[in-house]
Amino acid sequence: MSKRLTPIHLPNSLNYPIEIASCLVPQGSYVKKGTPLLLYRFFTKVKEDQEDGSEVYVDREFVEQFECPVEGELVEWAVKKEESIENFSKIVAKLHEPCTHEVNYGGLCAICGKNITSQDYMGYSDMARANISMTHNTGDLTVSLEEASRLESENVKRLRQEKRLSLIVDLDQTIIHATVDPTVGEWMSDPGNVNYDVLRDVRSFNLQEGPSGYTSCYYIKFRPGLAQFLQKISELYELHIYTMGTKAYAKEVAKIIDPTGKLFQDRVLSRDDSGSLAQKSLRRLFPCDTSMVVVIDDRGDVWDWNPNLIKVVPYEFFVGIGDINSNFLAKSTPLPEQEQLIPLEIPKDEPDSVDEINEENEETPEYDSSNSSYAQDSSTIPEKTLLKDTFLQNREALEEQNKERVTALELQKSERPLAKQQNALLEDEGKPTPSHTLLHNRDHELERLEKVLKDIHAVYYEEENDISSRSGNHKHANVGLIIPKMKQKVLKGCRLLFSGVIPLGVDVLSSDIAKWAMSFGAEVVLDFSVPPTHLIAAKIRTEKVKKAVSMGNIKVVKLNWLTESLSQWKRLPESDYLLYPSYDLPDRNLSEHSYSSSSDDEQRISELNDRELDEIDWQAADQDVENALKDLSDDNDFDTGSISASQSQPEALEVNTPIKRKADLIQPSYNYDGEKRRKENDNHEGYDLLPNSSTKGEESAENENELDDLADIMEAELSKDTA
């Protein structure tokens, strides 16, 4: 067996180019660390004083010695006398070391026991040779690149023999959901509570939070089907836990989901040992070879959208709690809830709520985490700059964030958000029934995820067998290439435009939902200048929705068409997710008057919407108009409900329709044609929101007059408020 030799390089800090002046140690000699190995010369300009008192720069030759940075037998000189060396990449000698200190534990070589923390005057330290951490449960144990490569090669060989891959599993909102709200414990002990049945399989444990002795009771809900999922997938994958929770938290959760320790064993990595307080990296566990590693996580950003990642839909059982360990991470923006079509025609004699009648803006409001103050990414916890240094170098930062985390947990326990939400639900809906439960077991993500993981495993070993069958081929299949190839097929050819999905102030192409969609082959566009194939709409009344419907060749679908397609890794039929159940609207319903963004009437209404209709005092506006009309007519030509033309009437008030309230504002653009729909399809539940078909004749003219007059009144009111 040949000796493993250590190459010796000159420092990068030398004044290159240099010339070897002399080799001081004979080949075959044993040298100690710090022994002079060679002399080298170099030339540089120096300043010298002249006889006349002036100073000039002249070239001078200097000779220095280079000392051996390691201990061992000098097996081979790689340079000779008078040889010129241009940079530090040149190997000058090769030594055989008795110990290469490739495994470091707490500053000591784990092989020979030598202290390797010392550093010489050139900045060299044996600690730098073993700086790769690849174990799960401690950051104090590090290895060299060569040792890491050897260990991984052995692991890869074992997995291929077992026909398995490696699977990194996130905990919070991926396979479990956690809370410290004591309301859960009270509901679990009350058989009469409406949430009692869905809490039967919730587990709990007490955990001391840091050195303060503060204790929290955690309630853990398994994602439906978790036990079967882990058991089946463990036959195809070796399982690893990688969480941003604390080490104590990760161990307790691992005990609950794997009580025998058979599935995960000691392969549990927490943020305490991960080397980063805000990011996750495959290189932390697999520094040399990630070709057999798959990741499942509800957050793509913490992995920088690694090609080995399978992003799952976040599991939200405890409503509004979010990720209990996310205060270390950058804030994530939740997707908006899908706005539903209103099934009944609005009675004209009843006032409408703002949400029902006010046409929505194109984008969702800026995300305000204060609306979910019990989630760990809430405004009670300052957003942190991403920290990339190791835990050992950031103990103070870690301690500070742990204190903030404890503060957030205390807030969640004292505020009892689940109890507040359940009480609000019962107040809204009346007498408690099973349908009034706040918590629900309706998640099927693990079923879909199991199928995806099985498909990836099958494709990997199919490719691996194909490659190995070719003689002389030393390549192997790569999950990092297989997963993107499979994903790109799902939405290939789809150009997506979003409406009401991405909050204001968030760059569309940098948003999680856009990156997720693009990783599946979709193209994301910003407007209609590049015609989209799909409009993904979370809100039913936006300019983009109207324009897309009027164009006729764009599929206007709900947000869950996209999220479920991404979750299932297949393009689901759009017909099941159309924003309007009867999408193929007649051409007469898509008239320019109803939809065209260039329509003067619609433009004026849109402008008024942009100026916050909710701030208008409608009663005061009505009263002002009535007072103005009374002042203009001494003969009572006008009644209080409508205005008729008169020769003495100013041109600005020549209207012949009743004064409209805010509820009537959207009628020229949309109406609820429920009666007609019921006759067309008796089996159809609810009613469709249809464009107003009144585009010609007397009714159209009346509508146009209504819009003109209403716009004038509203603009006058806004001007008065502004003044």
Swiss-Prot record:
Disulfide bridge map: none
Feature: compositional bias, Polar residues: 639-650
Organism: Schizosaccharomyces pombe (strain 972 / ATCC 24843) (Fission yeast)
Transmembrane regions listed in the UniProt entry: none
Any GO molecular function: RNA polymerase II CTD heptapeptide repeat phosphatase activity
Protein name: RNA polymerase II subunit A C-terminal domain phosphatase
Low complexity bias locations: 367-379
UniProt-listed NCBIfam families: FCP1_euk (TIGR02250)
Function summary: Processively dephosphorylates 'Ser-2' and 'Ser-5' of the heptad repeats YSPTSPS in the C-terminal domain of the largest RNA polymerase II subunit. This promotes the activity of RNA polymerase II.
Subunit: Monomer.
Example of a GO biological process term: signaling
Cellular component GO terms held in the UniProt record: nucleus
Region (Disordered): 345-380, 631-723
Domain annotation FCP1 homology: ranges: 160-341
Residue ranges of domain BRCT in the record: 486-579
SUPFAM superfamilies assigned: BRCT domain (SSF52113), HAD-like (SSF56784)
Basic and acidic residues biased stretches: 673-687
Highest taxon, organism lineage: Eukaryota
Segments of skewed composition (Acidic residues): 352-366, 700-715
Cofactor: Mg(2+); Mn(2+); Co(2+)
Subcellular localization, as worded in the UniProt entry: Nucleus
